[in-house]
Swiss-Prot record:
Residues 1-18 form a transit peptide. Belongs to the terpene synthase family. Tpsd subfamily. This is (+)-alpha pinene synthase 1, chloroplastic. It comes from the Eukaryota. Pfam families: Terpene_synth (PF01397), Terpene_synth_C (PF03936). Binds 3 Mg(2+) or Mn(2+) ions per subunit. Its cofactor is Mg(2+); Mn(2+). Disulfide bonds: none annotated. The gene is TPS-(+)Apin1. GO terms for biological process: alpha-pinene metabolic process; diterpenoid biosynthetic process; green leaf volatile biosynthetic process; terpenoid biosynthetic process. It is an enzyme of class 4 (lyase). It comes from Pinus banksiana. SUPFAM superfamilies: Terpenoid cyclases/Protein prenyltransferases, Terpenoid synthases. It is found in: Plastid, Chloroplast. Monoterpene synthase (TPS) involved in the biosynthesis of monoterpene natural products included in conifer oleoresin secretions and volatile emissions; these compounds contribute to biotic and abiotic stress defense against herbivores and pathogens. Catalyzes the conversion of (2E)-geranyl diphosphate (GPP) to (+)-alpha-pinene.
Length: 628
């Protein structure tokens, strides 16, 4: 690892902006990072920070530190400040509202006898196609009632064999049944995967003709999409996924580059659990007009596409302003001075924007970006930079939850502590106005548990202790921080979350336990080698190997990944189970945050190394607009 030189913290008064724009002055910080002050028996200790990230030889006055050597922030602050917001003119909003009305009229035509969408031979597929299209184009929030009406109609004709293309279609149709299974299940309707049994031949196998037409390929593509919404024990869904994956990979070798091939490549790569809605919308806008296999009037496709582009760009202008606000917050709190840590606030905000595209959810997007960034800095303090003595002091300060606690902290910790204290309290107070109950104490308790898990891991690192797999996972589910990044932003969304519902989503619910376990395990499969190189031996992989002497590292990784796959199916069920009593829309927020982190760990540790995939995501969904 390369040496990282410490940069002095700003000695001026630190003007701190809270999440909602209020400001106040913090006490001046007069010491620099290499001259840290901390309380011990009334004496000030000033340890040096100049040491290797892999070895440390300290004398009486030096504290050994490990530094990870993370790369710097990739997004130039001046460039972010100069981003244009060219779609804020009222005329764009007026144009979008006009198109929304026209699309609503198209939905209304579905209830007209003998209308363009009501042929008894194709009406079911028409409805499913409309619902699927507005969802993938990112404009579904405007048509909630219309979507419910369309799906109620489809479900009224659903049978144990699935459906045909229309209510009088007769023969079960692969495309309509697969799309119906996926869409109805995602909207909370009770549909069995056994409908897919009726799409097999007499040998119990999925089959298709040797001639791979565009229509047939799209049929199998929807079968693949449906197979991903699997519950535990659904062998038919596993078989459908295996068959459709092989078929689509073979088709890619035969068809020319096109919108269809682009869509196949995208879905095979991202599936469902690493597929972020705005990211898919950006792809789907590019390929939407190329499907010529479905008998939808050209004018209808054009209206949907025009609305999707306008909505994407209007939201794009809002996203840029929010990102500029986040960048100012990052600078005002002095985060650029913390040179030993990762700075991924732009990436975190982008990920939030990819799952929450309602303009009203600004507090959620900014809150997620800020909390995730602060957690990342704390992670680097507890895992690498802080000494055990400093970490004990910081942990005690968080337990007291009192600004006066910072007097005994090293200077570099003071600013971080106050950033957390200010923003969490402010967000909790704003959430309390919405929820009508004490979210401040609720948030504080969740942070106490989170910090407690951090100090436990720090003790393991300091002592060289390698826990059992179960011991590690139980602590790791808390230390990952997904509960923190989910809970507080979710409480600002504007809909009530009474304790009765919250307890089904938050700790200690099974839903929360599954999301935390999935993310801890998935993250460890991508991080364990780099963590080990920094002296952080405990991981899901290494602890599993400890519990199973003789197993190879590769086999341990495969076992952990298999656990993730099984837990993911359990999470699907917890999200969509019809008997939970909690609306899917409430749980979907936490589920989508799980998808965010799943995406970040798809290729590597995307939160330590900002990969080309993450950079492309920021460019495609935040920096660039869609050509109209």
């Amino acid at each position: 690892m390369a040496l990282v030189s410490a940069v002095p913290l700003n000695s001026k008064l630190c003007l701190c902006r809270t999440l909602f724009g209020f400001s106040h002055e913090l006490k001046a910080i007069h010491s620099t990072v290499p001259n840290l002050g901390m309380c011990r028996g009334g004496k000030s200790i000033a340890p040096s920070m100049s040491m290797s990230s892999t070895t440390s030889v300290s004398n009486e006055d030096e504290a050994p530190r490990r530094i990870a050597g993370h790369h710097s922030n990739l997004w130039d602050d001046d460039s972010i400040a100069s981003l244009s917001t060219s779609y804020e003119a009222p005329s764009y909003r007026e144009g979008a509202d006009r198109l929304i009305g026209e699309v609503k009229n198209i939905f209304d035509l579905m209830s007209v006898e003998d209308g363009v969408f009501t042929s008894p031979l194709s009406d079911l597929h028409h409805r499913l196609w409309m619902v699927d299209s507005v969802e993938r184009l990112g404009i579904d929030r405007h048509f909630k009632d219309e979507i419910n009406s369309a799906l109620d109609h489809v479900y009224s004709y659903w049978t144990e064999k699935g459906i045909g293309r229309g209510r009088e279609g007769g023969v079960t149709d692969l495309n309509s049944t697969a799309l119906g299974l996926r869409t109805l299940r995602l909207h909370g309707y009770t549909v069995s995967s056994h409908v897919l049994d009726h799409l097999k031949n007499e040998k119990g196998q999925f089959t298709c003709s040797a001639i791979q037409t565009e229509g047939e390929i799209r049929d199998v593509l929807n079968l693949f999409r449906a197979s991903l919404i699997a519950f535990p024990g659904e062998k038919i869904m596993e078989a459908a996924e295996i068959f459709s994956t092989m078929y689509l990979k073979d088709a890619l070798q035969k068809i020319p580059p096109s919108g269809l091939s682009q869509e196949i490549e995208y879905l095979l790569e991202f599936g469902w659990h690493t597929n972020l809605p705005r990211m898919e919308t950006r792809m789907y806008i590019d390929v939407f007009g190329e499907d010529t296999t479905f008998e939808t009037p050209y004018l209808i496709r054009e209206k949907l596409l025009e609305l999707a582009k306008l909505e994407f760009n209007i939201f794009h202008s809002l996203v840029k302003r929010e990102l500029q606000s986040l960048s100012r917050w990052w600078k005002d709190y002095g985060f650029p001075e913390i040179t030993f840590s990762r700075h991924r606030h732009v990436e975190y905000y982008t990920l939030a924007a990819c799952i929450a595209n309602d303009p009203k959810h600004s507090a959620f997007r900014l809150g997620f970006g800020k909390i995730s960034h602060m957690i990342t800095i704390l992670d680097d303090i507890y895992d690498t930079f802080g000494t055990m003595e400093e970490l004990e002091l910081l942990t005690a300060a968080f337990k007291r939850w009192d600004p006066s606690s910072i007097e005994c902290l090293p200077d570099y910790m003071k600013g971080v502590y106050m950033a957390v204290y200010d923003n969490i309290n402010e967000m909790a107070r704003e959430a309390q106005k919405i929820q009508g109950w004490d979210t401040v104490s609720y948030a504080r308790k969740s942070w106490e548990a989170f910090i407690g898990a951090y100090i436990q891991e720090a003790k393991w690192i300091s002592s060289g202790y390698l826990p059992t797999f179960d011991e590690y996972l139980e602590n790791g589910k808390v230390s990952f921080g997904s509960r923190i990044t989910t809970l507080e932003p979710m409480l600002t969304l504007g809909f009530p979350l009474p304790p009765r519902i919250l307890q089904e989503i938050d700790f200690p619910s099974k839903f929360n336990d599954l999301t935390c376990a999935i993310l801890r395990l998935k993250g460890d499969t991508q991080c364990y080698k780099a963590d080990r190189a920094r002296g952080e031996e405990a991981s899901a992989v290494s602890c599993y190997m400890k519990d199973h002497p003789g197993i190879t590292e590769e086999d341990a990784v495969n076992q952990v990944n298999a656990m993730v796959d099984n837990l993911t199916k359990e999470l699907n069920w917890e999200l969509l189970r019809p008997d939970s009593g909690v609306p899917i829309s409430y749980k979907k927020v936490a589920f989508d945050i799980c998808r965010v982190f799943h995406y970040g760990y798809k290729y590597r540790d995307g939160f330590s190394v900002a990969s080309v995939e993450i950079k492309n995501l920021v460019t495609r969904t935040v920096v660039e607009t869609v050509p109209l």
